[in-house]
């Protein structure tokens, strides 16, 4: 067994120890590493590779899985079979965090299946394992001998009291303004020195950020602060990469060199380039003075079809073999990519004719779906998102059964991406990893501006339906959700908007140029060097996601991208606030929730034996009631009078009014006797309505039985006429 370890120094916040071991567990896998965080959090990562290339596969078949084991936290699964089932949302999000920096680090053309499995064997209370998992996956891949440009270091940072703290615990986040996860690797720059290439960033303002900023004077997570955080991460990433390299240096690695299958041959590329390059340059260079010109895209489709016909003829004539037909789409895309990038770098227009900082036409509308609690449509160019808000009692908040320290959340954001959004036919069913990731990004963008539980005691479910997609439906979801939440009457602390930025880099006349693009389309995302999504208020950033294909983004380029993103965000916020600038009245179909505080010792009395009391209140009023451990009672109903009636009944139980002579009550008949009826005035207080008084209710006529006038369960207005020495109550009917 070999091991390597290092220390992450957080100054006054203490240290964290990272340790990697190999050669003890999972020895059959091509690469396996056990990663430790402070000795108690333990992950096993294995990297395996298929012996043969996957047939009919034109992409790199990499699979990343995270297996959460309940025993890691000393739990038995709560499912019927007491066994782990499908991955939790948190595990899926961890898979995406690992996959995003790992995938581009393999050699292009690799077609052997590669599977990385990270198993959580042990986790200390209050710890997060995602950042450690990035390092574990990188280390197991590094020692597997596969062609890999790692190692990759991943670190989670929290901005606490102005300091970026690495690998924070859950309790640390209560004082944090921003939560940042960064992955990167060491590379040799043009000057021959080692530097850190940032590959992936995932970030969010925390739930308490608003209060920390506005009530405690904490630093706002604006563009400058985010840049500082990313720079701070580089120090920790270098340390993590050094630990992995030290481990690999202690091993006698047998490097595996699977065959590489390039997407196209040089001869196919040259032939296709000769067919289409000049025509594509005419189309895209011609967009320079044409403004927004989506017709350029259809023109390029015509060029592609003509070129395919010509290439097909060349195959039939024997110039290329039949298998070369599958290379045509990749070769065409490579030529198109080169033309489009060159046009942008040389100062010509983008693919659709826009300027570098232009946003596509915007449109927004609220209250578009009847009966729902809130709804809105947001459109940016061809990207269209429907947002729908549903409100309910807090007892409907999501309970999280995973290894994450977070056990529940009251704001739930779901994102759907049906195949018709891109004009295609496809599978419809449970959400894919991409949909889960997009929904979580939009959720994190909005959580910092949601009202507190005390100010707005509702569980909130937000659904984003991507109705049309051509670039950044996730940021469209943020905008649609802001509108929908306000339409539902949710008092957001501030509106939030999002925008996707892109980057194209390359040499022009020997000089390296970087050009940032605002509001990238789907094609620009595929052909560019960066996908950079930024969401926030007019004041600060609430969520950020960055993926890049470059070996590092210069600081001034990142700063420029953040500045352009802010300008675009403010422009979109202006459109949103023109549509709706304050919360609407809540829908008549939404529940009205009232909060009542009762003494903790009265909780059992309110619930009653086997829930008898609380169930009777719910049955009688139609309201829903939930009770918190601290004595907070939430009462909700879509009808205001039902809530008021339930509140009165709760108060009558926990804060009963002592009956006195002359006080009136709307009582309930609980028992009939030959001499009269017993009426319940308040819980535990009954009085007797004598038969002589009951006769007065029917003008004094003779009664064989009181059942002729009153029945059990009937409501009757009575007044206390006398209280005898034993405390017995005598009642009279009030007409």
From Swiss-Prot:
One of its GO terms (cellular component) is cytosol. It catalyses: RNA(n+1) + phosphate = RNA(n) + a ribonucleoside 5'-diphosphate. InterPro entries: ExoRNase_PH_dom1 (IPR001247), ExoRNase_PH_dom2 (IPR015847), ExoRNase_PH_dom2_sf (IPR036345), GPSI/PNP (IPR014069), KH_dom (IPR004087), KH_dom_type_1 (IPR004088), KH_dom_type_1_sf (IPR036612), NA-bd_OB-fold (IPR012340). Residues 591-650 form the KH domain. GO terms for biological process: mRNA catabolic process; RNA processing. GO terms for molecular function: 3'-5'-RNA exonuclease activity; magnesium ion binding; polyribonucleotide nucleotidyltransferase activity; RNA binding. Belongs to the polyribonucleotide nucleotidyltransferase family. Involved in mRNA degradation. Catalyzes the phosphorolysis of single-stranded polyribonucleotides processively in the 3'- to 5'-direction. This is Polyribonucleotide nucleotidyltransferase. It comes from Tropheryma whipplei (strain TW08/27).
